[in-house]
Regions:
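Basic, amphipathic N-terminal segments that precede the first structured/catalytic domain
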Residues: 5, 12-107
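A basic- and aromatic-enriched beta-loop-alpha substructure that forms the phosphate/nucleotide-
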Residues: 74-153
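Surface-exposed cleft-lining segments at the edges of enzyme active sites
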Residues: 83, 136-172, 207-218, 258
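Well-ordered, non-membrane alpha-helical segments in soluble/globular domains
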Residues: 90-94, 160-176, 213-229, 264-268
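Active-site segments of SGNH/GDSL-like serine hydrolases
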Residues: 150-157, 175-215
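Substrate-gating cap/lid alpha-helix
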Residues: 197-241
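Histidine-centered active-site loop/cap adjacent to the catalytic His
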Residues: 254-293
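Boundary detector for helix-to-coil junctions that initiate low-complexity/charged tails
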Residues: 280-393
Length: 393
């Protein structure tokens, strides 16, 4: 076996990042549970060693967030828990835009669940609210808004290009707000997506969701990816994209099965990627290059294994179909799928990259950066060991 090319060692450095100064990095989340759950001890037990959660929003549309506040009085017309009441108040008041400059968080992580899943309601005066069927629909304000002449419900399902245009205008305003009010804050785009398979309770084999739900998830993913791509490319922000690594949902998720409640190996994987972004922000170029190459090797390994899993399961299904044909047909007109796909090998460069990093950063930073490789390997193990996906029936 050929040896990987040597990586030139770099001089050890002291990382000029907040956690070395003795305090955790403050992270604010403008998004949903797909991001917020990464800062929950159920999913990442040790996250508080390195991160502190600052002001957040939940499930707000960026279009609504960047329009003027809606300060009309309101009351719930259905039972709502305190968190749901806060959710409505936060969305209507845009309080996050006041809280962030006061906090000056080190990092803001964005995800666009609110726009991908809900859309907005445009009031006659041009203000917007998030059309959240789980929250504001339970208030008398929502009933009053819908009764106003000139009110419009807008979603990408109705007009993808029109909605995208409104969203880009809002994002441009948000980017200007960050530059003016949060000049030292690092913005990270978390690429959310919808899973379309679910692992039933007590089982290990994923099942496809019903076809209608799968089609809806795929359409939503296409628009969500459009949002992610724009936010990642237009404003010079960092991004974390695990959407091509093949994650499913599960009945035994702490919050129950849903397209955005991923298998539990997702959350350590996300945190490893965030560690890379945070730890290398002010690092020497050599360290940034090593961490980026380790990240790329881990991502390629998981994506290649995800593709292999799909191909291997298709191969097994093709073999099963061939075995059902009469023997004489198989002999005279074989239609076998050929050789089975071979799973990808672990990246040869990983060990060399880790060795170079060990000599370039302190022990804590090395332990965290090395999780780029270990969390990828954990997910690869799941991809290899999990039985083939079954149909929804």
């Amino acid at each position: 076996m050929s040896q990987p090319d040597p990586v030139t060692p770099v001089t050890p450095v002291t990382q000029d990042v907040p956690e070395v100064s003795g305090r955790p990095v403050t992270v604010s989340v403008l998004g949903s549970c797909i991001t917020r759950d990464n800062f929950n001890s159920r999913f990442n037990p040790d996250y508080k060693r390195w991160y502190r959660v600052g002001p957040t929003t939940n499930q707000s549309s960026m279009i609504a967030l960047m329009s003027p506040p809606v300060d009309e009085p309101w009351e719930p017309v259905q039972e709502m828990k305190p968190y749901g009441l806060w959710n409505v108040r936060s969305d209507l008041s845009r309080e996050i835009l006041t809280l962030l400059p006061e906090e000056q968080p080190d990092v803001v992580v964005l995800d666009f669940f609110g726009d991908a899943h809900f859309g907005v309601v445009r009031l006659p005066d041009g203000r917007f609210v998030t059309d959240n069927r789980w929250r504001i629909h339970k208030t008398d304000l929502y009933e009053r808004i819908l009764a106003m002449p000139g009110t419009e419900q807008l979603s990408w399902e109705q007009d993808a290009d029109g909605y995208f245009g409104l969203w880009v205008e809002a994002m441009d305003r948000f980017a200007a707000y960050v530059a003016d009010q949060l000049p030292d804050t690092q913005v990270v785009v978390h690429w959310g997506f919808n899973a379309d398979e679910v692992v039933p309770s007590g089982e290990s084999t994923p099942r496809r969701m019903p076809s209608r739900r799968r089609r809806a998830a795929r359409k939503r993913n296409a628009f969500w990816r459009r949002l992610n791509e724009h936010a990642s490319s237009a404003y010079g922000w960092e991004s974390i994209d695990l959407s091509r690594e093949y994650y499913v949902t599960l009945d035994d998720h702490p919050w129950g099965p849903m397209e955005v409640h991923y298998t539990l190996d997702y959350y350590p994987r996300f945190l490893a990627e965030l560690d890379r972004v945070v730890l290398t922000r002010s690092a020497p170029e050599e360290v940034r290059v090593l961490a980026r190459e380790l990240h790329e090797a881990a991502a390629e390994y998981t994506r290649d294994t995800a593709r292999w899993r799909i191909a291997a399961h298709e191969h097994q299904r093709a073999l099963a179909v061939e075995r059902e044909r009469p023997t004489w047909k198989r002999v005279l007109r074989p239609r076998g799928p050929g050789a089975a796909p071979v799973p990808p090998a672990p990246p040869a460069a990983t060990a060399t990259l880790l060795e170079a990093l060990r000599g370039a950063v302190d022990d804590d930073a090395f332990a965290r950066l090395s999780r780029l490789a270990t969390t990828a390997e954990e997910h690869v193990r799941w991809l290899r060991e999990t039985p083939p996906t079954l149909s929804a029936d």
